[in-house]
Amino acid sequence: MPKLYEGHLIGQGLRFGIVIGRFNEFITNKLLSGALDALNRHGVADQDIEVAWVPGAFEIPMVARKMASAMKYDAVICLGAVIRGATPHFDYVAGEVAKGVARIGLESGVPTIFGVITADSIEQAIERAGAKAGNKGWDAAVTAIEMANLMKILK
């Protein structure tokens, strides 16, 4: 039988950094609420959570890299909302943010979680921020807890 590794969902004693984009704040506030609720319900103390607001999604990777390189967080959670408009701006921003967040996790070894909603409409973003389709902030926080614990096991 192979040896299996899996991160558990107990957040007590873990530290988290959250980077959140202010653009589309009516959506990102809901993501932050979901993430904080998930962290607290899984045993993470408020004093073990630090939140950094950035102007928009494009700035998330820069601050996430700073947090990951500080090596004081067990995981960094990236939250934002990019909503498609009439120009190709959406494609550039969404793609670069996703690549940046992934690169930071790979280079730093600190789980860096992509909790950025990419939506075709405001309605779709609202659904993913706590209405019909769950809350992607909550999902990102639970993923961060699991990955932080898995990385501790694999050290």
Swiss-Prot record:
Residues reported to bind (2S)-2-hydroxy-3-oxobutyl phosphate: 86-87, 128
A GO cellular component annotation in the UniProt record: riboflavin synthase complex
CDD domains (UniProt xref): Lumazine_synthase-I
Gene3D superfamilies on file: Lumazine/riboflavin synthase
Keyword list, A-Z: Riboflavin biosynthesis, Transferase
A biological-process GO annotation: riboflavin biosynthetic process
EC number: 2.5.1.78
The keyword Transferase appears for this protein: yes
Catalytic activity reported: (2S)-2-hydroxy-3-oxobutyl phosphate + 5-amino-6-(D-ribitylamino)uracil = 6,7-dimethyl-8-(1-D-ribityl)lumazine + phosphate + 2 H2O + H(+)
Keyword Protein transport appears in the UniProt entry: no
Entry's Gene Ontology molecular function annotations: 6,7-dimethyl-8-ribityllumazine synthase activity
Binding residues annotated for 5-amino-6-(D-ribitylamino)uracil, in chain numbering: 23, 57-59, 81-83, 114
Active site: 89 (proton donor)
Pathway: Cofactor biosynthesis; riboflavin biosynthesis; riboflavin from 2-hydroxy-3-oxobutyl phosphate and 5-amino-6-(D-ribitylamino)uracil: step 1/2
Function per UniProt: Catalyzes the formation of 6,7-dimethyl-8-ribityllumazine by condensation of 5-amino-6-(D-ribitylamino)uracil with 3,4-dihydroxy-2-butanone 4-phosphate. This is the penultimate step in the biosynthesis of riboflavin.
UniProt record similarity statement: Belongs to the DMRL synthase family.
UniProt xrefs under NCBIfam families: lumazine-synth, PRK00061.1-4
UniProt protein name: 6,7-dimethyl-8-ribityllumazine synthase
Organism name: Pelotomaculum thermopropionicum (strain DSM 13744 / JCM 10971 / SI)
